[in-house]
Amino acid sequence: MNSTQRDLIAGEVSKALARKVIPKDIMEAHDRGAIKLHDLDYFINPIYNCELVNLEDMLQNGTVINNKLIEKPQSIKTAMNIATQISAQVASSQYGGQTISLTHLAPFVRISKEKIENKFAKYPMLPEVRDQIIEDELKIEIKDAVQTFNYQVNTLQTCNGQSPFMSVCIYLNEDPEYAYEVALLAEEIFKQRIQGMKNKFGIEATQTFPKLLYFLDENNTYEGSEYFWLTQLAVKCTSIRMNPDYMSVKKMKEVIGYAFPTMGCRAILSLWFDDEGNPIFYGRGNLGVQTVNLPFVALEAKRDNKDFFEVLDKYLDLCRRMGEIRYNKLKGVKAEVCPILWQYGAISRLNADDDIIDVIDKKGFTVTLGYSGIYEATKVTKGVSHTTEEGHEFALKLITYLEDKCKEWKANNPHTRWALYGTPQESTTDFFCKAIRREFGEVEDVTDKGFITNSYHVDVREKIDAFSKFSFEATLQDHSLGGAVSYCETYPMQKNPEALLQVVQHIYENIMYGEINFESDTCGVCGLQGVMEYVDGKWTCPQCGNNDIKQMSVCRRVCGYLSDDGTWNEGRTKDIINRVKHL
């Protein structure tokens, strides 16, 4: 696409200019692959990574898009349509993911209901008949609103030719007053997601956006709770479409103190409170990520006969300096650089000539230290998997060390609010693996498999059941409070939703954030809806032999998001085809 090509060219220019600004020693560590400076293709622009969009402010108080005033909507259909327009504008103004909340849309369900009630108030009829008509009319409007929302999110394009990387928070108790309205919206979203969205072959396939974040709480997790029916529908949806994903209110409150959504696929904000002591989540964001290649560190320490943590400190300091560079380059930037964010409510309501750094400071934007390959680093250092007792002890020591470094940096420089982040590694898994191979040659259980394991995750080849995997990874996720997510791999579970429900309830009790992965593919030649096989370097339909990637949809969890194009880098593809089933 022309827009994508233009963005790629601009990205190469940005990378070249970034090399003239970033200190030589930091750039050299990136080039060697000891660290990864993410999103250098956007570095020269005064923009940031990801955010929680303050949709409530924008819908209730109005916003401006393309110099046109958008006033408070008067129906759920209009509100959801405006939400997609906001999302596209926000996505074109940053380079990471974004999250909106159904709680901010729920009041407009009530407005629509009141309009329907007024419409039928003048007609004489039995109260129970009127109530049924009102309910039916409201559900029709919600259905139309959700359908428009889905089509908009999946057909709108940002300035780089992509759909907005949007997540939707579905948290019934985020504002208990609107729990019922949130449930009505979620019900319709799940129903339409189950049905699927027709792809270019006319097959109802799994839609990739928006990502759905469903919060498990006391009122929806177990049989007998008020909204258990909605969780049953959510599980059915997951069993077919790999969405929603699940966040545990119980565990988040135990570990963090509050429950709130991720920014996009996994980034989590640090706590920040306003002058009245109220926690603030929406209208905040993250300034960027730099990731340390832990198996690279382990191999360098082993080669040079040095202490692992001594070598680690060297590369961590480079990451710290890079994070401060990201913060400092936003100093002096005026709000007019991106009105939708800084002037019209997504983040703040500044005047055009106000400095954005004041909001970044006052609202506690985070900077993140990413990490990759705890499994491989443990294998190099201790000779065992981190699922063993000895390996787990080292892994806990390592992730706690990284967590403490973030606390130390934040204390020394309160402007950079550091948080520890389990890097998604969509491309980094390949980048790091090849970097290690260049520096150290082929290394068993590190480079020979062709990829580096995501963050603290269990090696994708290791046999372990879903319940044990989530329980084990929870001990490490609890320290990765700048963002992390755990997965389990299953077969498609349409015929066994009861088993999947047990996994979901296990997530509620044991881990803050979990997802379920399986294959959801379609063949555009024969119409097969099943699993494409990877044969001789090509995805191939087992029914008709079609191996033209343009004539099929291969849908997998690539990082936190789903992807259905099947054209992933070598490392990510090897990760995907090596995944064992946990259920």
Functional labels for PLM-detected ranges:
Residues 543-583:
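Long insertion/accessory domains within large nucleic-acid-processing enzymes
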Residues 1-363, 384, 388-554:
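Conserved catalytic cores of very large enzyme subunits
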Residues 140-150, 379-380, 563, 572, ...:
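Metallocofactor- and cofactor-centric catalytic cores in central/energy metabolism, strongly enriched
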Residues 370-373, 482, 560, 571:
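Glycine-centered flexibility sites
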Residues 367-380, 400, 557:
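Contiguous, well-ordered alpha-helical segments that form the cores/surfaces of helical PPI scaffolds
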